[in-house]
Amino acid sequence: MIIIKRFLHIKTVPKSYGNQLSKFKYSKQIPTHEVLTKLGYITYPRAGLVNWSKMGLLIQNKISQIIRQRMDEIQFEEVSLSLISHKELWKLTNRWDQEEIFKLVGDEYLLVPTAEEEITNYVKKQFLESYKNFPLALYQINPKFRNEKRPRGGLLRGKEFLMKDAYSFDLNESEAMKTYEKVVGAYHKIFQDLGIPYVKAEADSGDIGGSLSHEWHYLNSSGEDTVFECNECHNVSNMEKALSYPKEIDETIEVSVIYFTTEDKSTLICAYYPSNRVLEPKFIQNEIPDIDLDSINDLSEFNHDISTRIVRIMDSRLSSRSKFPDFPISNFINRSLITTLTDIPIVLAQEGEICGHCEEGKLSASSAIEVGHTFYLGDKYSKPLDLEVDVPTSNNSIEKQRIMMGCYGIGISRIIAAIAEINRDEKGLKWPRSIAPWEVTVVEVSKQKQLKNVNDNNHHNNPQDNFQEIYNILNQANIDYRLDNRSDSMGKKLKQSDLLGIPLSIILGNQYPIIEIEVRGNKKNNNNNSWLQSYTENKDQFDWKVETDAQGNDTKHYIHKDGLVTVVNSLLNDM
């Protein structure tokens, strides 16, 4: 009889695993970007540049797969555009002169920081043959580049970053808004899949442009952004979008004024606000849409022009008794040309002020890390790039229809940095199950102890044969594990698995077929213990025992090998 021995594939830790740990003394005070380097996830060859190891790529790929699944569900198609773009398109959209653009030698090309120009040009060349090609929705996952002058924070602000950028193309605004809401729904699912609490905040569109946008944030004290949430209507807005009213007015406050004009220069705008606050000119735009947001310092051109119209806009923190500066145009006497707008919030909000959205609740401020942004662009790019399609009308004629666009970004490398920052403790990182490089580290008792146990107990079975049975079980159950087959001690291996943030560790020791499982990962929402239901149903069958800490959190599980898959899956489902 011929016996065919089945080849057993055992997945082991990468070569980069633990390489830098022998001299690394972890402390929670060490910046997260340094921790990621010491743990072997990434390296920085130069400030702002990053190399990814196998372990870092495993996390990248899991996040990318979550994004792909949710974007595919809403019928976005994946593409991959060139990372180099010609200046011609960027001049048409007035973005060629932005400081953060990486221009190549010869000043003809750039490394793309985002792809609105190129994707619009791609659609123009490929899909304008028929209006029936719309709606159209595309996305890509690839590197982007920013000429960051002072890179800092590792992956949070570098010269290169991994990004998912998506773009939608609709025949009208109504359909474009439906697409926007569809993407917002997909983003909620993506961030829920990632397993870390997040907020969606109303936002200013900034350099990207457009009339509607939302930012997606992780709340954390290290974040460079600030978001405000109302305790009544629960509106969440970023700093540049949060309108607020004072709890009470300080009539003794000093008043400052900054001058603007309308775009046609026919009207002088005087913005009065408390000297101890920060004016946000875009808030004035809510009342005066045609304001030129570049302030002016020289008012001499208005000194002799008595036909100039003047609008005075008063911040809501001021009253008629406030200490206003003198009016700058001394010979202006035509008061019929002066319009005064009062009680208008035009300064950046502060914590504890009244919500400008519902005008009832109080605002609380939180530091946050931005990891995603959704924009409704309208014709911001389709107009200068002439993206129009022939559409039949009701009277059987043909008319040009300008395409309405949206764009939607997620910073994959930023997510990795942010989650690493948020999910740290005194032992190291704590990756959510959804993006951990692997879910379970397997550690075997040393070969010497295996042999000693066989000799002491007169066992005939080779422990390695028993352990290979476990790898078969894990492989068949599609559990994402890695065996730490390095020569270090078991204690050191377990400590390093904790440090690197792997959710679970399985210990194959001398008590086999009883297996020990150590719990490292956080529970979702900090209160999800669905494993308890499985424990109640299976504890006797699998000889399942549990150790807890002083707070009642499960830290170790002991189970018979026959219950390994059931227990591991029930624990991972909580993480």
From Swiss-Prot:
This is Proline--tRNA ligase, cytoplasmic. Its main location: cytoplasm. Pfam families: HGTP_anticodon (PF03129), tRNA-synt_2b (PF00587). It is found in: Cytoplasm. It comes from the Eukaryota. Its EC number is 6.1.1.15. One of its GO terms (cellular component) is mitochondrion. It is an enzyme of class 6 (ligase). The keyword Ligase applies. One of its GO terms (biological process) is prolyl-tRNA aminoacylation. It catalyses: tRNA(Pro) + L-proline + ATP = L-prolyl-tRNA(Pro) + AMP + diphosphate. Belongs to the class-II aminoacyl-tRNA synthetase family. CDD domains: ProRS_core_prok. SUPFAM superfamilies: Class II aaRS ABD-related (SSF52954), Class II aaRS and biotin synthetases (SSF55681). Keywords: Aminoacyl-tRNA synthetase, ATP-binding, Cytoplasm, Ligase, Nucleotide-binding, Protein biosynthesis. It comes from Candida albicans. One of its GO terms (molecular function) is proline-tRNA ligase activity.
